[in-house]
C-alpha cells in the first residue's frame, strides 16, 4: 500500500469516528442551551454571521474556530454555553449576482453561449499604500470578489462552484441564494463539530419577518434617539445617468467604493510661473494624500511634465484657483468644491496646461519646515488617480526620496526642466516620524537597504513602500508638531481636521478604482442625499468610549484599534436603494445596508429559537406561539428594554413575552465576540456605538469581550482562488478530517498578525492523533492484561503526576486568555512529551508504567484537548466507559504544583543530558589526543556541589542586591563589572568573574530570582540516588559513585567548576572483570544462560541490573533473584529436580558481595561468611502477582 493510501486510510478512520460522535451529540442534543433558573453561570460567544453567496472557506473557519474553542473550554468550566450561528444575506452582492445571471441569459441565451474572443479585463495596479492605509471604516463592498478566480461572467463563477446549468438558472432569483447556501453551510459546520445551537439560526432581510421586525424596531429607536440624520454623503455617482451608480448598474468596478483623501492646498507664491502670472486670485496646486500626518516633512511637490493639467475656479465664491487634472476637477465639482454642482469653470485659456509650464513654481506647503518649496518633475505620476499633483515627503515616501535624489544627482535633468540649484539642492529629508527598526528617516533607510538608485526601479520601490507605509502607519510615532509622541494612526484624522479647519486642506473623495456605468459613463464620487448614522456626534462617541472602557479585548492592539476608530469615526450611510434587506421604516424607498442591520443582532439570537425554531426564514411560528406581526416595536421593547406590558401596543400575551425576556436576560450580554481584524474599523466599533444607543443606561447589556484575529494564510501564501491557493471548509475536512483541521487551525496563530495554515502541519496532526488513539487502545489492553504497575510511588511517577498538574494549570490559563496556540502547546504537544519522558524513565529502570497515572494522563489529555479536538476526545471518553459526554464534563482538578519536585525533575533531565554529552566526548577524543580507541567505561563518579564556591557566592550576593534595587532586573555587564572590581576578594578571580556572570544572567532570564540562590534548593544526592538505576542504564554503566565537593581529597578543579544543580560526571578506569554464568533452571521457562561480567565488590543487586541490561528476555516486570549452589564444584552438573528446581541452591540477598581472588576464583560474601561459587550461579525470574 502506498504512503498516500495509508495516510488516506488514517483520515478515513478519523472521519468515521467523527461521524459517529456527531450522531451521538445530535441524539443527545448536546449543544442546545436554554435559560436556566438555578443560577448556573452562562457564556455567550458569537461570530459575525457569514455572507451567503458561497460556501464557507478556511478563512471563515479560522475566525469561527476562536469561538468554537472558547465554547468548548467554557463548557469544561461548568458554564451553560451558547454559541448561536446565523447567516447574513443583507446587501447588494446577492442581488447584483442574480441580476447579472438574468442579463447573461438575456444577452447570451440559456445556457449562455459566451463569445470566445472576449478581451480579459485589465487589472488595475493596486498601490501598497492604498491597501495599507485606506479608510478602514468602510465594509467590504463585495464579498464575492475574493472568490471568483479569473472567471469573467457570473455564470462561469457559479460553474466554478460545481453547479450545473439547470441549477445556476435558479440563482437568477436572489431569494434562491438565501435558501441554497445556509443549509450547505450548516452541513459543513456540523461536519466540523461546531458546538452551535442550530435552533437559533436564521437568515436576515425582509424574507425573515421576525428579523425584519427586529431591525425596524432597532432603527426606530435610533431615530427617536436622534442618532440618524438625513443629508449629503459621498456616493459613487454617474453624471450621465444623474443618479448613484450601484453595483447592478455598473459595467465594471463592482464592489468599488469611495476612497477619501486629504486635499492639501499648496499656495503658489511670487514670482508665479509665466502661464499663471495674470491670475489675480490665490492659486493652489492641490495634492491628494492619504497621509496628512506626514505634511510636516514636505520638501517640494511633484508634477508630471507631460500630463495636461487644468486651472479652474474653486470654492463657492470662486476666489481661489486650483490646479489639478481635468478628471479630478470633474470629481471635485460634484463635492461642493466649485461654485456650481457638476460644472467646472476653467480659467480662460487654461483648460489644459502641460505640467512642464508650472515646474519651478514657488509654493507655501502647509505644516512644512521650509517656508518656500518648489514644484519639481516626477515621471511616474499618473493622471487617472488622485489629482496629478503629488506632495513630496522624502523622509517617509521612497518614491519621493528616489525622485528628489535623481534631481540632486543629475544636473542635466534639472537643466532640462529649467530648475535652478536653489530649487533642489538645499532640500533634505526632514525627520518627522520614528519607526522602530527603520529610524526617523524610514524612506531613506529602506532605499539604502534595497540599493535603490533611481525612481525607475518600480519593483524595489514597491517593496520599500510596503515596508515603510505598513510600519509607519501602524507603529510610527510623531516627532514634530503638537501631536509629537502620539502614534501616526491616532493622529491622521485629527491632523486632517486641523488642516481643514485652518483652510489649508479640504476633503476629496474619488472611486477606489475606475467605475464605468452601463451607460458608458465614467463614474465620480458625488455628495448625495442619504440617511446616515451620526457616529461623529460627540455625545454618542463619549457613550461608545464608556462601552469600550471595561471591555476585554484580549490584546492591546485590538483595544488601540477600537479606540482609534471611535475617535475618528464620523457619519456613516446606513441606507441603500438597491439590494436585499430591511426597508427603512419611515422611508421605504431605502434599504438598511449590511453593516447597519448587524450591530445588535446578537440580542436576537437569545429569542430566535422561540420565535422561529425549525425554519431559518421565519416561515414557521416557533414554540412561543408568537406571529411575526405581533412583534411590534412595543413588544420588542418589552423583551429587550423591560418596558411595562401594554396590551394595546403589544398584541401578544404577556406570558409569551416573558418567556422571551427570560432568555434575553439570562444570556445577554455577549461574553466574547470573535472576528477578523478587518472588522475592527467598522462592524466591531459600530457594535459599541449601537449598544450604547439601545441600552444607554443599562451597562449590564454592554458586550464584555471582543477578540480579533489576523487573516489566515495558506502554506504561507495569501488565500486566493485565482492562484489556486484556496480551500473551502468542506475540502479541508475531507482532506485532513475535522479534528486534524481543527488542531492545525489552533496551531496557526492567535494574534492580529496573519496566521498560517500549513498542509504539512495538518498531515502531521493526523498522524499524531491517529498514533495517540492506537496508543490508548494499547494501554487499555495492557491494563486488562494486568501488565501495568499498580503503585505510583517512584520518582518518575511523582514527577509525571506533578508535571501533569503543572501543564493542566498552564493550559487552563492559556484557554482563559484565548491563546489557543499556547493551549495546544501546553495541553497537547508538551503534554504528550511528558508522557514520552515518563515512558522512557520507566523503561530506563526496567519498570512498567503506573496504571493509575497512565489513565489519569489519558483522561486529562482528552479533557484538556477536547475544546480543540472534541471528536477524538469524545470517542476515547466513551471507550473508557466514562459517564456522560466529555463536552459536559468538568475541567480536571489538580493538586498544587510541587516546585521542589519540578526542580528535581529538571535537575535529573539536564544532568543526564550533560552526562550523555560527557560520554560522547569521552568516547570521541580530539584526534591529537587519540593514541588508542578509548575503552567503553563501566564506572563513573558524580560530583555534587551543595553550594557555590565563596568567590561565586560573593558575585551572586552582588547580583541579588542589584535585582532587588532594580525591580527584578539586572544591570548591564559594564555596571556589574565595576561592582565586582570594587570587591578585594574577587580580584584574583577577575578573568573568571564575567564569564560566570554571563552564565548566571542567562539562567536568570529563564528562571528569575531563583537563579541567584547560592545553594541548591533540593537534596541533589537523594534525587541522584533515587534515579541511579536510570542513570546507569542510560549510560550503560555498572557502577556509579556519588561524592560531594566538600569532601576531602577532591580535585581542586572539580571543586572550582562544580556548582549547585550542575553536577560533574567523571569516568573512572575500568576494573578487571571475570565472567560468571547465570543459569535459569525453572521448568518450562524460555530463559537462557546469561554471561555476566563480575567486578570485585559487585553486589547482588548490581549483578541483577547487569543481567537485565544484557538479556532482553528478562522483562522489566520480572522479579529476579540469584542463587548459589550448595556444592560449588558439582552443583551445575547435577540433575535438576522437576518438583523443586532450586533444592540444590541457596538464595542470595541483594546486599551480598561478589569477590574474586588472584587465581580468579569467584566467591560471595554474605554477612561474615564467604562461599565459593565456581563459575555458575542460578537465577529465578518470576512475574509478580498483582
From Swiss-Prot:
A motif ('KMSKS' region) lies at residues 718-722. Its EC number is 6.1.1.4. Keywords: Aminoacyl-tRNA synthetase, ATP-binding, Ligase, Nucleotide-binding, Protein biosynthesis. GO terms for biological process: leucyl-tRNA aminoacylation; positive regulation of protein phosphorylation; translation. A motif ('HIGH' region) lies at residues 50-60. One of its GO terms (molecular function) is leucine-tRNA ligase activity. Disruption phenotype: RNAi-mediated knockdown results in an increase in the expression of gpdh-1 independent of hypertonic stress. It catalyses: tRNA(Leu) + L-leucine + ATP = L-leucyl-tRNA(Leu) + AMP + diphosphate. This is Leucine--tRNA ligase.
Amino acid at each position: 500500500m502506498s504512503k498516500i493510501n495509508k495516510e488516506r486510510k488514517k483520515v478515513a478512520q478519523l472521519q468515521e469516528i467523527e461521524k459517529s460522535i456527531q450522531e451521538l451529540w445530535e441524539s443527545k442534543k448536546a449543544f442546545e442551551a436554554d435559560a436556566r433558573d438555578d443560577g448556573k453561570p452562562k457564556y455567550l460567544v458569537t461570530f459575525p454571521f457569514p455572507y451567503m453567496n458561497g460556501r464557507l472557506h478556511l478563512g471563515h473557519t479560522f475566525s469561527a474556530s476562536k469561538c468554537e474553542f472558547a465554547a468548548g473550554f467554557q463548557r469544561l468550566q461548568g458554564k451553560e454555553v451558547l454559541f448561536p450561528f446565523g447567516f447574513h444575506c443583507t446587501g447588494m452582492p446577492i442581488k447584483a449576482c442574480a441580476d447579472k445571471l438574468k442579463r447573461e441569459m438575456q444577452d447570451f441565451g440559456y445556457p449562455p453561449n459566451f463569445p470566445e474572443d472576449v478581451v480579459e479585463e485589465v487589472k488595475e495596479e493596486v498601490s501598497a499604500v492604498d491597501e495599507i492605509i485606506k479608510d478602514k471604516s468602510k465594509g467590504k463592498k463585495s464579498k464575492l470578489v475574493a472568490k471568483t478566480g479569473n472567471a469573467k461572467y457570473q455564470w462561469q463563477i457559479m460553474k466554478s462552484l460545481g453547479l450545473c446549468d439547470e441549477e445556476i438558472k435558479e440563482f437568477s432569483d436572489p431569494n434562491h441564494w438565501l435558501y441554497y447556501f445556509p443549509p450547505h453551510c450548516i452541513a459543513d459546520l456540523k461536519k466540523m463539530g461546531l458546538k452551535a445551537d442550530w435552533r437559533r439560526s436564521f437568515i436576515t432581510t425582509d424574507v425573515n419577518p421576525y428579523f425584519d421586525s427586529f431591525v425596524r424596531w432597532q432603527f426606530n429607536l435610533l431615530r427617536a434617539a436622534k442618532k440618524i440624520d438625513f443629508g449629503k454623503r459621498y456616493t459613487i455617482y454617474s453624471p450621465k445617468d444623474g443618479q448613484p451608480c450601484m453595483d447592478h448598474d455598473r459595467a465594471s468596478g463592482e464592489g468599488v467604493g469611495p476612497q477619501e483623501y486629504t486635499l492639501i492646498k499648496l499656495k503658489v507664491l511670487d514670482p508665479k510661473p509665466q502661464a499663471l502670472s495674470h491670475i489675480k486670485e490665490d492659486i493652489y496646486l492641490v495634492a491628494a494624500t492619504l497621509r496628512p500626518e506626514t505634511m510636516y516633512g514636505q520638501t517640494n511637490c511633484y508634477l508630471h511634465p507631460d500630463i495636461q493639467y487644468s486651472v479652474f475656479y474653486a470654492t463657492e465664491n470662486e476666489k481661489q484657483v486650483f490646479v489639478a487634472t481635468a478628471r479630478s476637477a470633474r470629481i471635485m465639482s460634484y463635492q461642493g468644491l466649485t461654485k456650481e454642482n457638476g460644472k467646472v469653470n476653467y480659467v480662460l485659456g487654461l483648460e489644459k496646461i502641460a505640467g512642464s509650464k508650472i515646474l519651478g513654481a514657488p509654493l507655501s506647503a502647509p505644516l512644512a519646515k521650509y517656508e518656500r518649496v518648489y514644484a519639481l518633475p516626477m515621471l511616474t505620476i499618473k493622471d487617472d488617480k488622485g489629482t496629478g499633483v503629488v506632495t513630496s515627503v522624502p523622509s517617509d515616501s521612497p518614491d519621493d526620496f528616489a525622485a528628489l535624489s535623481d534631481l540632486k544627482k543629475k544636473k542635466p535633468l534639472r537643466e532640462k526642466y529649467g530648475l535652478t540649484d536653489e530649487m533642489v539642492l538645499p532640500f533634505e529629508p526632514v525627520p518627522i516620524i520614528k519607526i522602530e527598526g527603520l529610524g526617523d528617516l524610514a524612506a531613506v533607510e529602506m532605499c539604502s537597504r534595497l540599493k535603490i538608485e533611481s525612481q525607475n526601479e518600480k519593483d524595489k520601490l514597491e517593496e520599500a513602500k510596503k515596508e515603510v507605509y505598513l510600519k509607519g502607519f501602524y507603529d510610527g510615532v510623531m516627532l514634530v508638531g503638537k501631536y509629537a509622541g502620539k502614534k501616526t494612526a491616532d493622529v491622521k484624522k485629527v491632523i486632517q481636521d486641523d488642516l481643514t479647519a485652518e483652510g489649508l486642506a479640504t476633503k476629496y473623495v474619488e472611486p477606489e478604482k475606475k467605475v464605468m456605468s452601463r451607460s458608458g459613463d465614467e463614474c465620480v464620487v458625488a455628495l448625495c442625499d442619504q440617511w446616515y448614522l451620526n457616529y461623529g456626534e460627540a455625545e454618542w462617541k463619549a457613550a461608545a468610549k464608556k462601552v469600550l472602557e471595561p471591555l476585554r479585548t484580549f490584546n492591546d492592539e485590538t483595544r488601540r484599534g477600537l479606540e482609534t476608530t471611535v475617535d475618528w469615526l464620523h457619519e456613516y450611510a446606513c441606507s441603500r436603494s438597491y439590494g436585499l434587506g430591511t426597508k427603512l421604516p419611515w422611508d421605504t424607498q431605502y434599504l438598511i445596508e449590511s453593516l447597519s442591520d448587524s450591530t445588535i443582532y446578537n440580542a436576537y439570537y437569545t429569542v430566535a429559537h422561540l420565535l422561529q425554531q425549525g425554519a431559518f426564514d421565519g416561515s414557521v411560528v416557533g414554540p412561543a406561539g408568537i406571529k411575526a406581526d405581533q412583534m411590534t416595536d412595543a413588544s420588542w421593547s418589552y423583551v429587550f428594554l423591560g418596558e411595562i406590558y401594554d396590551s394595546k401596543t403589544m398584541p401578544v400575551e404577556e406570558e409569551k413575552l416573558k418567556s422571551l425576556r427570560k432568555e434575553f436576560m439570562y444570556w445577554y450580554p455577549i461574553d466574547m465576540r470573535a472576528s477578523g481584524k478587518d472588522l475592527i474599523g467598522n462592524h466591531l466599533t459600530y457594535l459599541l456605538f449601537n449598544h450604547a444607543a439601545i441600552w444607554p443606561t443599562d451597562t449590564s447589556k454592554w458586550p464584555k469581550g471582543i477578540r480579533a484575529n489576523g487573516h489566515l494564510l495558506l502554506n504561507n501564501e495569501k488565500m486566493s482562488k485565482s492562484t489556486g491557493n484556496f480551500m473551502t471548509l468542506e475540502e479541508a475536512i475531507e482532506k485532513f478530517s475535522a479534528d486534524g483541521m481543527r488542531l492545525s487551525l489552533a496551531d496557526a496563530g492567535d494574534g492580529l498578525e496573519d496566521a498560517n495554515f500549513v498542509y504539512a502541519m495538518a498531515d502531521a496532526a493526523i498522524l499524531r492523533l491517529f498514533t495517540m488513539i492506537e496508543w490508548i487502545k494499547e494501554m487499555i489492553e495492557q491494563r486488562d492484561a494486568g501488565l501495568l504497575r499498580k503503585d505510583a510511588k517512584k520518582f518518575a511517577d511523582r514527577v509525571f503526576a506533578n508535571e501533569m498538574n503543572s501543564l493542566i494549570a498552564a493550559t487552563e490559563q492559556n484557554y482563559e486568555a484565548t491563546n489557543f496556540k499556547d493551549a495546544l502547546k501546553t495541553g497537547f504537544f508538551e503534554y504528550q512529551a511528558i508522557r514520552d519522558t515518563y515512558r522512557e524513565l520507566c523503561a530506563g529502570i526496567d519498570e512498567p508504567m503506573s496504571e493509575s497515572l497512565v489513565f489519569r494522563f489519558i483522561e486529562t489529555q482528552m479533557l484538556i484537548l477536547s475544546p480543540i479536538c472534541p471528536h477524538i476526545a469524545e470517542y476515547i471518553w466513551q471507550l473508557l466507559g466514562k459517564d456522560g459526554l466529555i463536552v459536559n464534563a468538568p475541567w480536571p482538578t489538580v493538586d498544587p504544583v510541587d516546585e521542589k519536585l519540578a526542580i528535581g525533575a529538571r535537575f535529573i533531565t539536564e544532568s543526564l543530558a550533560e552526562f550523555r554529552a560527557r560520554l560522547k566526548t569521552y568516547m570521541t577524543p580530539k584526534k591529537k589526543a587519540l593514541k588508542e580507541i578509548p575503552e567503553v567505561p563501566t564506572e563513573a563518579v558524580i560530583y555534587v556541589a551543595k553550594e557555590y564556591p565563596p568567590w561565586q557566592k560573593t558575585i551572586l550576593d552582588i547580583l541579588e542586591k542589584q535585582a532587588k534595587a532594580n525591580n527584578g532586573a539586572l544591570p548591564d555587564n559594564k555596571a556589574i563589572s565595576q561592582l565586582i572590581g570594587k570587591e578585594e576578594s574577587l580580584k584574583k578571580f577577575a578573568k573568571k568573574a564575567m564569564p560566570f556572570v554571563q552564565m548566571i544572567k542567562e539562567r536568570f532570564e529563564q528562571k528569575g530570582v531563583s537563579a541567584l540562590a547560592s545553594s541548591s534548593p533540593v537534596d541533589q544526592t537523594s534525587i541522584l540516588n533515587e534515579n541511579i538505576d536510570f542513570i546507569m542504564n542510560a549510560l550503560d554503566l555498572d557502577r556509579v559513585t556519588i561524592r560531594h565537593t566538600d569532601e576531602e581529597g577532591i580535585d581542586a578543579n572539580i571543586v572550582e567548576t562544580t556548582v549547585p544543580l550542575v553536577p560533574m560526571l567523571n569516568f573512572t578506569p575500568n576494573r578487571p572483570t571475570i565472567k560468571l554464568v547465570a543459569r535459569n533452571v525453572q521448568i518450562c521457562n524460555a530463559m537462557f544462560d546469561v554471561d555476566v561480567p563480575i567486578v570485585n565488590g559487585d553486589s547482588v543487586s548490581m549483578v541483577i541490573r547487569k543481567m537485565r541490561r544484557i538479556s532482553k528476555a528478562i522483562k522489566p516486570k520480572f522479579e529476579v533473584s540469584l542463587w548459589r549452589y550448595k556444592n560449588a564444584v558439582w552443583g551445575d552438573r547435577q540433575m535438576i529436580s522437576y518438583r523443586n528446581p532450586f533444592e540444590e541452591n541457596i538464595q542470595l540477598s541483594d546486599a551480598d558481595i561478589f569477590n574474586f581472588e588472584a587465581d580468579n576464583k569467584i566467591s560471595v560474601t554474605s554477612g561474615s561468611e564467604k562461599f565459593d561459587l565456581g563459575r555458575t550461579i542460578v537465577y529465578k525470574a518470576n512475574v509478580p502477582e498483582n
